[in-house]
């Protein structure tokens, strides 16, 4: 009897602990985003991906659904509706949102009546108008032609930013009061991205971060090392800290080509360059459990073993919504930058994404160049440049950044932790496995054999391509065996019946 009582008591404790863990998880459930359309071939195309990257940079985990889905909203504390079509929000959603206790932002042309009542909202429609958007801090975008949008003419609460038109003058970009917010327009690659951040920060109560970083992508073992050295020297001479997205090495790491790659990255590191590891190139949408995790850990160890402190990760946005990539690929890193999608190859797509502790919002240098006014961004940004192909491109980038307040990524607290290695930065110092790194700007290249370079190239083509090669070999061998059996059987058949 006594044993039964003890077992029952332990069972109650376990159930209580599980429930408490579940409650904790639900209390920090992130943001639920609903959208009606991907807005292909319209002015709004790309705004969903932009919103997802913005929320990640704000430190928000995301659950994403289309209007046709029917998820449980009972535990959701933050909701964003993104309307790209002209159609109104379905009635079933209007009632559910009206009954919800969540903080709620509506983006688009037709806010539901209950939201208009809550915000005492009145709007005026404009079509084919040139508009200029300004943020709360005075950041101004270039004028753009908008097919149709609303201008807010009356509201309750706090107004954020401005939309200016030649015909109608200025009106607030967005408004917020208590648990409700509204913005009439949101597009990728214009000032509405940052104007919306002001509205969402006020609604969700999140802290503003305002660092600006310079990010150079496309660095890998096959980049022009002389150009990379020139880049590091030029940025260093101009006093501009920078971040390099460096491709991984996970096979043939003892080859001379790999060692020389590590050598140039050490040089970059000594010239105020921060190294982030870019994820492996994906060529095939499948991966056995643990394969990517092993590759990421090997790649981190290659850098660590060569005194290169990779302080975070870079990847296209879709990695954050893939069951394998987001878990095995991102697990070691507390810092990362999500880049716009270029070529999407999922293993298995999922509708929820995680958030890095630190994740600057990547914008192209061309887009950055269109902004004017007070260059105060409401979230951390990474002004992103592809690897420079010429000194002319390098000079243009340095001139663009020369008078800007560019931050040093190493001044933040970053941590990368695998089974084998721990890499950290603290107040500008770099540590690998609790040992401070001595920054060394002496280049000690080793002679590279052509054969080794070619082998290394094969090892870095893409970590899923090996499966393609394996399956191709299996299929060819199988067809060969079938052919041999067919010929053998045919001869037996002919021998039997010819007699």
Q: What are these language model-derived features?
A:
Residues 30-38, 105-114, 239-333, 340-351, ...:
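Metal-dependent polysaccharide deacetylase catalytic core of the NodB/CE4 family, i.e.
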Residues 51-77, 88, 360-371:
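A short, well-structured beta->alpha microelement
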Residues 75-117, 272:
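Short alpha-beta junction capping motif
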Residues 76-77, 102-103, 117-130, 134-144, ...:
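A glycine-centered loop/beta-turn motif at secondary-structure junctions
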Residues 187-192, 196-269, 282:
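Active-site beta->alpha N-cap acidic-glycine motif
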Residues 203-204, 211-222, 306, 319, ...:
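Catalytic grooves of carbohydrate-active enzymes
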Residues 330-366, 408-415:
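His/Asp/Glu-enriched short active-site or ligand-binding loop at hydrolase and phosphoryl-transfer sites
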Residues 440-499:
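C-terminal single-pass membrane-anchor helix
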């Amino acid at each position: 009897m006594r044993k039964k009582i003890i077992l029952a008591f332990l069972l109650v404790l376990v159930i209580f602990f599980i429930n408490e863990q579940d409650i904790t998880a639900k209390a920090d459930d992130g943001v639920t985003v609903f959208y009606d359309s991907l807005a292909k071939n319209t002015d709004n195309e790309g705004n969903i991906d932009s919103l997802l990257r913005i929320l990640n940079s704000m430190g928000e985990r995301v659950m994403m659904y289309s209007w046709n889905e029917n998820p449980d909203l009972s535990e959701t504390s933050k909701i964003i509706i993104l309307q790209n079509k002209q159609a109104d929000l379905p009635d079933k959603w209007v009632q559910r949102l009206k009954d919800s206790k969540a903080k709620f932002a509506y983006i688009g042309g037709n806010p539901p009546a209950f939201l208009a009542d809550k915000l005492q909202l009145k709007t005026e429609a404009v079509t084919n108008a040139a508009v200029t958007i300004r943020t709360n801090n005075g950041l101004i975008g270039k004028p753009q032609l908008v097919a149709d949008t609303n201008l807010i003419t009356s509201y309750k609460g706090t107004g954020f930013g401005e939309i200016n038109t030649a015909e109608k003058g200025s009106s607030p970009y967005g408004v917020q009061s208590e648990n409700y917010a509204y913005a009439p327009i949101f597009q990728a690659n214009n000032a509405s991205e940052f104007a919306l951040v002001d509205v969402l920060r006020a609604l969700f109560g999140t802290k503003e971060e305002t660092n600006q970083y310079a990010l150079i992508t496309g660095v890998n073992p096959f980049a022009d090392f002389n150009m990379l050295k020139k880049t590091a020297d030029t940025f260093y001479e101009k006093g501009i800290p920078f971040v390099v997205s460096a491709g991984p090495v996970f096979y043939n790491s003892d080859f001379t080509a790999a060692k020389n790659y590590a050598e140039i990255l050490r040089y970059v590191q000594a010239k105020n360059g921060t190294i982030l590891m870019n994820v492996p190139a994906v060529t095939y949408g499948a991966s056995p459990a643990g394969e990517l995790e092993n590759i990421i850990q090997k790649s981190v160890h290659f850098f660590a073993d060569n005194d290169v402190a990779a302080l975070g990760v870079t990847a296209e946005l879709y990695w954050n919504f893939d069951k394998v990539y987001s878990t095995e690929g991102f697990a070691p890193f507390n810092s990362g930058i999500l880049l716009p999608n270029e070529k999407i190859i999922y293993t298995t797509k999922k509708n929820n994404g995680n958030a890095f502790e630190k994740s600057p919002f990547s914008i192209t240098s061309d887009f950055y160049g269109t902004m004017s006014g007070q260059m105060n961004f409401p979230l951390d940004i990474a002004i992103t440049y592809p690897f420079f192909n010429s000194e002319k491109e390098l000079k243009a980038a340095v001139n663009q950044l020369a008078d800007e307040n560019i931050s040093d990524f190493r001044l933040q607290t970053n941590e990368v932790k695998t089974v084998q290695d721990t890499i950290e930065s603290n107040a500008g110092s770099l540590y690998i496995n609790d040992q401070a790194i001595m920054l060394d700007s002496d280049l000690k290249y080793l002679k590279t054999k052509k054969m080794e370079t070619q082998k290394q190239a094969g090892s870095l083509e893409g970590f899923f391509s090996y499966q393609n090669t394996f399956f191709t070999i299996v299929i060819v061998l199988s067809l060969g065996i079938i052919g041999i059996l067919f010929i053998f059987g045919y001869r037996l058949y002919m021998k039997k019946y010819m007699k």
